[in-house]
């Protein structure tokens, strides 16, 4: 054993979950650039910096010689050339269809497992022009290394402001809403404050109990309705395809401020409305009606149960964090997987008023925020994995329809080694659902990325179309009311 291969660390419970058979989740980050990528610059940077990040210079080993039998992280020497791939691209062969080439290339990655004999990440440099970039960099890493927020903090640490290439990107301070709730009744008398505090506590306990019972039922038998976006789902090992769309973050903020809600509420409302209309189209096609997405004909069944697992960041400090703080020992904004899932029911129906889905989404999320199910779900997972193993959790996600995630990205345009980034699209594969939706804010943009099982959802661009239409209808309705 070499000197570099002496430090071992057991996997965290969440890392063990992501490594378990039948899950094997990986995160893919696609980054568009305004100019071609120089592979030599990327390789040189990795040689100097990869050793600073413990998970990116550690491989997975099975330890049987210590007090802990099982998988562990072992620090090892990294040969970066083994992790960076630059495929030869015949521009005549792809016939200027750069988007199709990138889509096919990344889809093939989902069928190629990461090599566990070395650190679980790789980078693919695709110097091909697409509709929104001159080149695309694809980073793939196993979910056991980190969650999306950790990876975003790592990416931001590697970039500089495009407006000033000597300056690090701005890292905005984001406070949890819960931290401000103590001031909610500050101007009222002690009696009113006491009554409200008791009512608040009772609601919190009740909501938590109900959510825990629903979580338990979901892990055992409580399934979503089989719909065109979930029927015939096979294994999480099936090939996945990815599609992204860029919309205006300013439009989302306009709706957020006008409706007095959060960005997450707006995104949930847009997704709920878009999936309703997409499902209406799919049911129409299935019934032979041949409806278009603009049709008012309601083809939806009477009752549909669709739930989304919404990712919740459990760190005390949310948003992008300085990388050195995340890597520090006992950090409150620690590196790794420190998030949970809250299962949110969707109201699937065709609404004539574009604002109704927003109000429904806000009502649902307000109740979920007034519950301790997210941190308790995380603690329960840790306890059961440490006690019984990981198999029990395979069913919880497979009994729901989709997963949603929203990650805060750079607040201004940034560059990597002087090459301006046009978009950041983060997604994943290995999950059992046929649909996963990620949102990432970048400067004044919101990038929507959809991961699908093409055997179940052959037209993911139609979902993005419906999301754009929903967002525009909501904005136009609010603009009309303000005139």
UniProtKB/Swiss-Prot annotation:
Membrane-topology annotation of the record: Single-pass membrane protein
Reported induction:
Induced in roots during drought and salt stresses.
Q: Write down the glycosylated positions.
A: 394, 399
Q: Which UniProt keywords apply?
A: Acyltransferase, Cell membrane, Endoplasmic reticulum, Glycoprotein, Membrane, Stress response, Transferase, Transmembrane, Transmembrane helix
Reactions catalysed according to its record:
an acyl-CoA + a 1,2-diacyl-sn-glycerol = a triacyl-sn-glycerol + CoA; a long chain fatty alcohol + a fatty acyl-CoA = a wax ester + CoA
EC number(s): the record gives: 2.3.1.20, 2.3.1.75
Intervals, Lumenal compartment: 223-483
Q: Which residues cross the membrane?
A: 204-222
Give the tissue specificity. Answer: Mostly expressed in roots.
Q: GO molecular function of the protein, one example?
A: O-acyltransferase activity
- Which InterPro entries does this entry report, sorted A to Z? O-acyltransferase_WSD1-like, O-acyltransferase_WSD1_C, O-acyltransferase_WSD1_N
Q: Which family does it belong to?
A: In the N-terminal section; belongs to the long-chain O-acyltransferase family.
Known function = Bifunctional wax ester synthase/diacylglycerol acyltransferase. Involved in cuticular wax biosynthesis.
Q: What is this protein called?
A: Wax ester synthase/diacylglycerol acyltransferase 10
């Amino acid at each position: 054993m070499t000197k570099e291969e002496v430090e071992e660390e057991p996997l965290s419970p969440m890392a063990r979950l992501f490594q378990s058979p039948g899950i094997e989740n990986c995160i893919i980050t696609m980054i568009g650039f305004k100019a071609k990528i120089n592979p030599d610059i990327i390789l040189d940077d990795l040689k100097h910096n990869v050793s600073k990040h413990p998970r990116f210079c550690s491989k997975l080993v099975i330890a049987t010689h210590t007090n802990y039998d099982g998988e562990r992280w072992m620090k090892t020497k990294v040969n970066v050339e083994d992790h960076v791939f630059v495929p030869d691209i015949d521009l005549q062969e792809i016939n200027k269809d750069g988007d199709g080439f990138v889509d096919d290339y990344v889809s093939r990655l989902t069928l190629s497992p990461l090599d566990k004999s070395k650190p679980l990440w790789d980078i693919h440099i695709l110097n091909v022009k697409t509709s929104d970039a001159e080149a695309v960099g694809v980073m793939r890493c196993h979910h056991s290394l980190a969650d999306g927020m950790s990876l975003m903090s790592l990416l931001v640490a590697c970039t500089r402001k495009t407006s000033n290439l000597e300056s690090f990107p701005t890292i905005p301070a984001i406070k949890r809403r819960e931290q401000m709730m103590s001031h909610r009744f500050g101007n009222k008398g002690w009696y009113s404050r006491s009554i409200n505090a008791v009512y608040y506590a009772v609601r919190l306990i009740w909501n938590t109990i109900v959510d825990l019972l629903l979580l338990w039922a979901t892990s055992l038998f409580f399934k979503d309705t089989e719909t065109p976006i979930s029927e015939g789902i096979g294994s999480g090992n099936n090939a996945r395809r990815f599609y992204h769309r860029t919309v205006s973050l300013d439009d989302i903020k306009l709706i957020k401020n006008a409706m007095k809600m959060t960005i997450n509420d707006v995104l949930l409302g847009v997704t709920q409305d878009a999936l309703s209309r997409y499902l209406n189209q799919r049911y129409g096609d299935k019934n032979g009606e041949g409806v278009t997405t603009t049709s008012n004909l309601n083809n939806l069944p009477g009752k549909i149960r669709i739930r989304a697992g919404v990712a919740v960041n459990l760190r005390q400090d949310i948003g992008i964090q300085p990388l050195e703080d995340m890597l520090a020992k006992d950090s409150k904004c620690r590196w790794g997987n420190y998030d949970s899932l809250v299962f949110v029911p969707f109201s699937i129906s065709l609404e004539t008023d574009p604002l109704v889905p927003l109000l429904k989404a806000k009502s649902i999320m307000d109740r979920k925020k007034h519950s301790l199910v997210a941190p308790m779900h995380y603690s329960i997972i840790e306890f059961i994995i440490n006690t019984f193993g990981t198999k029990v959790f395979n069913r919880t996600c497979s009994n729901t329809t989709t997963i949603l995630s929203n990650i805060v990205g750079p607040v201004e345009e940034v560059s990597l080694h002087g090459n301006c980034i046009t978009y950041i699209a983060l997604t994943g594969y290995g999950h059992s659902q046929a649909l996963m939706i990620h949102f990432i804010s970048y400067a004044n943009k919101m990038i929507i990325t959809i991961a699908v099982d093409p055997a179940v959802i052959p037209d993911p661009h139609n979902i993005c179309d419906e999301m754009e239409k929903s967002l525009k209808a909501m904005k136009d309705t609010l603009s009309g009311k303000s005139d």
